[in-house]
Amino acid sequence: MEEYEDFEMEDLSELVSYMDYLETQRLTISQLDYSLSIPPQLLVSREISKLEDEVCEMLKESSLFQLFRKHKGYLNVTDLVLPLWCEVQHEYYLLRRIKKKTPKMERGIKLHQILEYETSPPSERRVLDRTSKEEPWALRLLRQLEGIMLLQKNGITREFPIWGYYKESSIFGIIDEISLNNPSKSNFNSDIRNYFNFKMYDLSFVDNKTRFSSRKPGASQILSSKVQLMYYVHLFLNYFPSLGEKQQSIFRDISPTYSNRLHSQSHWWNMFLSQLSLDGTKDLGPKFLEQSILSIPDIPEDVFAGHNSLNGLYALVFASAKKLHLRLTDDNLTIAYRNDKTGEVVYKDKFSFSNKLLEASYTKAYQFWHNLREPEGVPAEEVYKCRSCEFQKECWWLKKKQYYPLSSP
């Protein structure tokens, strides 16, 4: 089974179950209009009374990123959006190293798996050499290649891994669903060297969220879902920059500071490999080559044999996507909320990409993960969130603000 970024334990996805029955007031971009300048100091000093002494000392020396994500070398997309619910709660979970898997989360994972298997059969691809740092990323590249072929053949692919940069941060995520508006199935050719030959189609992105009730999700939950999908779109376009080269779209300038770097295929890719200490030229070996050939039989064996490395597989993925002739439009982003038992879509929210919202959200998340300021808890109008929080009694933010979360919103 593929890894499901939405439900990784360290991403604290159990917060979604808290969000389900909570209503909230409407959030606007102005509520995320934080200063985009980074404070000069590296770490924020904390009052000892707010957290345990040893925790405070630890945070004076290291940031949350250094403590909990530096070993991976990147942040997951959900790492950037989950603190939007409550940064203080998120920090408590990280520092206490609390990991839970609830029945609701299990149902969500199962639903995602069912949706994935609707578009692609179960894969037996696995890491063959557990000492290799390159193989896990090679498997993700194979999944990308398979996803592009499914997109061409069936007009839809699900659980598409994607990674890259937003400003100074390396990010990894898994896109729930990518689809073409009017795909053609008639011109599929088994030879990768000439199977891409069809008209231009609009590209749509969908993020499937599990709902545990029939009620419309609250604005706070909708906000984080929108930001999450916008991260995916940003990563996808910068991973495949040729898709937006000739289009007059807001997607062309998502991250102006880094656009030149990210739009250079070799530059950003080599930078990513270097940051994670990966060898892009290392041959993945005969066993992995055999696995590649068996898992995607539509690609000729000699093609795989000539691309049996991270650089080689990325070149295949990049070349294949470049020939897709896709067109990106500003409003083809959708959040689909599904019943956790039946999988039925109970609510859809279609929206447009917002550079301002994404940048403001990212700046806040970056400051949180790198301890550039004190974590922020919920404002007074959202104190209802605290009723289901297990840190309610000890929460320093509530004590500081003198909120009373047991009262009704």
UniProtKB/Swiss-Prot annotation:
Q: Which domain of life is it from?
A: Eukaryota
Cofactor(s) required for function per UniProt? Mg(2+); [4Fe-4S] cluster
Q: Describe cofactor binding as the record notes it.
A: Binds 1 [4Fe-4S] cluster.
Which cellular component terms (GO) are annotated to the entry? mitochondrion; nucleus
GO-annotated biological processes: interstrand cross-link repair; mitochondrial DNA metabolic process; recombinational interstrand cross-link repair
| Keyword Calcium in annotation | no
Q: What is its EC number?
A: 3.1.-.-
Q: Which InterPro entries match?
A: EXOV (IPR019190)
Residue positions annotated to bind Mg(2+) are 176, 207
As one GO molecular function, the record gives: DNA binding
Q: What is the effect of changing residue 176 to A?
A: Impairs exonuclease activity
Keyword annotations: 4Fe-4S, Cytoplasm, DNA-binding, Exonuclease, Hydrolase, Iron, Iron-sulfur, Magnesium, Metal-binding, Mitochondrion, Nuclease, Nucleus
The similarity comment for this entry is: Belongs to the EXO5 family.
Q: How does it assemble?
A: Monomer.
- PANTHER family in UniProt: EXONUCLEASE V
Name listed for the protein in its UniProt record:
Exonuclease V
The gene name reads exo5
